[in-house]
C-alpha cells in the first residue's frame, strides 16, 4: 500500500470507516445539545431567528454530514457487472465532504479515483455513493483517501485502485494568520498502482485535465 498518510493505529483496518459509532444517532439528544450550545454561547433559543435552529442543525448533520454511518460502502458500490475490459477507469472531481472530529468542522473538496478492472465494471454513480458512505462520518481526509482506494479493491474486485482528494479544511482555513486559500492533498495507491509508476503517472496526468 502506497499512501500519503499511513495510520498505525491498530484498530484501523481497511474494513473500518471513520470514527467508530458505538450507538445509534439520537435525534432528540442532538437537538437538546444544539440548544445547550446556543445557551452556553449566550443566545436565546426561542426567538424568530433561533426557534428552529436545533431542528435544522440536526437534520443537516443526520441527513448530510453523518448519513454515511447508515450506509454500507460495499452495498453502495454493489456487485457491478461482468466485463472483460482491463483498461484503467478514471473518475474526476467527485464531490466529497466529512467532519473532522478534532473541531467538529467539515472538510470539503473533490475526489479523483481510478481502478484497474479485473472482470467487473461499476456504475459511476455507485462509486460516488460509496465515497459518500465512507466520507459522511466523523473522519479525516487521510482516512477517507485510504479507505476509498482499499474499498475499490476489496469490494470492487479491482486489480488496483488510486484515490487523490483535494479539500478545504475549515479548521485550517479559519485558523489565525491564514490566507484562506489553503488546500490539503492526500493520495493512496493500492494493488497494481503500488508498484506501477506508469499507471500512477497516467492517473495523475488524466486528473489534471
Swiss-Prot record:
Catalysis: reaction(s): GTP + H2O = 7,8-dihydroneopterin 3'-triphosphate + formate + H(+)
Return one Gene Ontology term, BP aspect: tetrahydrobiopterin biosynthetic process
Q: List the keywords (alphabetical).
A: GTP-binding, Hydrolase, Metal-binding, Nucleotide-binding, One-carbon metabolism, Zinc
Gene3D superfamilies, per database record? 3.30.1130.10
EC number(s) given by UniProt? 3.5.4.16
Q: State which pathway it belongs to.
A: Cofactor biosynthesis; 7,8-dihydroneopterin triphosphate biosynthesis; 7,8-dihydroneopterin triphosphate from GTP: step 1/1
- Top enzyme category: hydrolase
- In this chain, Zn(2+) is annotated as bound at 100, 103, 171
**MF (Gene Ontology):** GTP binding; GTP cyclohydrolase I activity; zinc ion binding
Q: Does the keyword Methyltransferase apply?
A: no
GO CC term, one of those recorded? cytoplasm
The entry describes its oligomerization and partners as: Toroid-shaped homodecamer, composed of two pentamers of five dimers.
Which family is this protein grouped under?
Belongs to the GTP cyclohydrolase I family.
Task: Identify this protein by name.
Answer: GTP cyclohydrolase 1
The root-end lineage is: Bacteria, Pseudomonadati, Pseudomonadota, Betaproteobacteria, Burkholderiales
Amino acid at each position: 500500500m502506497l499512501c500519503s498518510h499511513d495510520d498505525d493505529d491498530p484498530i484501523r483496518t481497511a474494513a473500518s470507516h471513520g470514527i467508530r459509532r458505538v450507538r445509534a444517532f439520537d435525534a432528540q439528544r442532538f437537538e437538546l445539545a444544539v440548544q445547550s450550545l446556543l445557551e452556553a454561547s449566550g443566545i436565546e433559543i426561542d426567538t424568530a431567528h433561533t426557534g428552529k435552529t436545533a431542528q435544522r442543525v440536526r437534520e443537516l448533520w443526520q441527513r448530510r454530514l453523518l448519513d454515511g454511518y447508515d450506509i454500507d460502502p460495499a452495498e453502495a458500490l454493489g456487485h457491478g457487472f461482468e466485463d472483460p475490459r482491463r483498461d484503467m477507469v478514471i473518475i474526476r472531481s467527485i464531490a466529497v465532504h466529512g467532519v473532522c472530529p478534532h473541531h467538529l468542522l467539515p472538510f470539503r473538496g473533490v475526489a479523483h479515483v481510478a481502478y484497474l478492472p479485473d472482470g467487473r465494471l461499476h456504475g459511476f454513480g455507485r462509486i460516488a455513493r460509496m465515497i459518500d458512505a465512507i466520507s459522511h462520518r466523523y473522519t479525516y481526509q487521510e482516512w477517507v483517501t485510504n479507505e476509498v482506494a482499499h474499498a475499490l479493491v476489496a469490494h470492487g474486485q479491482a486489480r488496483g485502485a488510486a484515490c487523490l482528494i483535494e479539500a478545504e479544511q475549515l479548521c485550517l482555513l479559519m485558523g489565525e494568520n491564514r490566507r484562506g486559500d489553503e488546500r490539503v492533498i492526500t493520495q493512496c495507491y493500492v494493488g497494481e498502482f503500488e508498484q506501477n509508476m506508469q499507471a500512477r503517472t497516467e492517473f495523475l496526468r488524466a486528473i489534471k485535465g
